[in-house]
């Protein structure tokens, strides 16, 4: 299940994507229009900035803006940033691999092999959904 933090990140990115490219948007405006608690949003925007998905400009006319084209930001990127591995078990993850305590041989485990396929298909589906797709759906 996607976390509330990841969902808010998606909403914030969608809001920024609807603004002119490179035009800073104040945190309070993002919070109000995307209906995200401001304090929570500040942490999310910092994570997005550290991941180079957004950048910020200081000052009276400052705020946050997208660093990537909305077409190049997908749900897999956001999910991994905020929620970690997509795999349902640690043994099915490449990045966070950890054998199950009750498994004798991970290479022969049929459950693991099926869950690796589920993870692959989930990643394909998440990568297909971009911020651009989402703002297109919302406005139609």
Predicted features by range, described:
Residues 67-140:
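Non-DNA-binding regulatory cores of transcription-related proteins
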Residues 50-53, 81:
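Residue cluster at the C-terminal edge of the helix-turn-helix DNA-binding motif
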Residues 28-34:
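A short alpha-helical element within helix-turn-helix/winged-helix DNA-binding domains
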Residues 53-60, 65-67:
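Beta-hairpin "wing" of winged helix-turn-helix
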Residues 9-21:
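Short amphipathic alpha-helical interface segments
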Residues 44-49:
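Basic amphipathic alpha-helical segments that dock to polyanions
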Residues 39:
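Key DNA-contact positions within bacterial/archaeal DNA-binding proteins
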């Amino acid at each position: 299940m996607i976390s509330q933090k990841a969902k808010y990140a998606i909403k914030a990115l969608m809001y920024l994507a609807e603004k002119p490219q490179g035009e800073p948007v104040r945190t309070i405006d993002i919070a109000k229009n995307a209906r995200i608690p401001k304090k929570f949003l500040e942490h999310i925007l910092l994570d997005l900035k550290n991941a180079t998905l957004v950048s910020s400009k200081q000052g009276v006319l400052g705020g946050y803006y997208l660093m990537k084209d909305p077409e190049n930001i997908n749900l897999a990127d956001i999910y991994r940033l905020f929620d970690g591995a997509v795999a349902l078990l640690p043994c099915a993850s490449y990045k966070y691999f950890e054998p199950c305590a009750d498994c004798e041989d991970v290479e022969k485990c049929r459950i693991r092999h099926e869950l690796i396929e589920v993870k692959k298909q989930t990643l394909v589906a998440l990568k297909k959904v971009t911020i651009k797709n989402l703002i297109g759906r919302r406005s139609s």
